[in-house]
């Protein structure tokens, strides 16, 4: 397949490397020193898991998506706040049969497209400030994706795959008689051939929330404390903040028809397995990058307000982490 990965950073880099290794025609959209390194030397993956090895794959790396033309699959590995500006150019990669797969954190902009409830078509302004993203690409091309993997870019052109290989993919159109379409099975098979653990979801929005409630609580707390996951899960004082945020997230999900089927303490037990891992917002603050507060936290507060679900602890923590980001020069006031 002809594959383009838009944003070949941490997760995008893992996807690009493994799909290229599996024989697909892969190109990447990147910027700056990272793009220069990939274009000149190839993309290097340092695997900290099964292989315990380092390898390099040559691939085309460009800054402008419009130079590549339509693809079979386009993965978006950007931070959520970077997507609105770039999406019009990403749209040039999408042909009539292209699968557009946003492998992103937080509430995705497509969440209420073809959602099939009274909320169908709702715009989440925390992730789509101008309310125009739904018109930039056809919703029929979008495949939902939830990533359960950890990676970091530690130097230009080099991605460290530090944990997990889980990629859940699913159709976003709830009117389909069978969500296991031929194209979704083809995509999952390609990911498996690339030695990733791909599963097909019959309800991708439930999978979005299953990950989101953890990110909603652990990410801002990690960013405020610089504590890794093991330390957070071992601190009853921090868990006294995490638990009510988990309860609030579960309540918002339920108000939109999603029942996760997991208690806060069960979700904390899942997080314990991450050990000394530094969660994404923690990494962003340490690297002095703009954090995904809007997509991961503010969007949930926005959705809570629309259905009158109180989220006082989430609001308080969001205010704290936002002010920390402003003070550090990562966000504007």
Predicted regions, residues:
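Rossmann-like NAD(P)(H) cofactor-binding subdomain of soluble oxidoreductases
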Residues: 54-154
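NAD(P)-dependent Rossmann-like dehydrogenase/reductase catalytic/cofactor-binding core
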Residues: 231, 239-333
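Short, hinge-like loop/turn segments at secondary-structure boundaries
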Residues: 44-47, 117-120, 159-163, 216-217, ...
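Internal alpha-helical scaffold of NAD(P)-dependent oxidoreductase catalytic cores
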Residues: 93, 134-211, 217, 223-261
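Residue-level detector of anion-binding/catalytic polar loops
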Residues: 2, 25, 197, 259, ...
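Nucleotide donor/acceptor-binding cores
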Residues: 1, 72, 165
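NAD(P)+-binding Rossmann beta1-loop-alpha1 motif at the extreme N-terminus of oxidoreductases
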Residues: 1-51
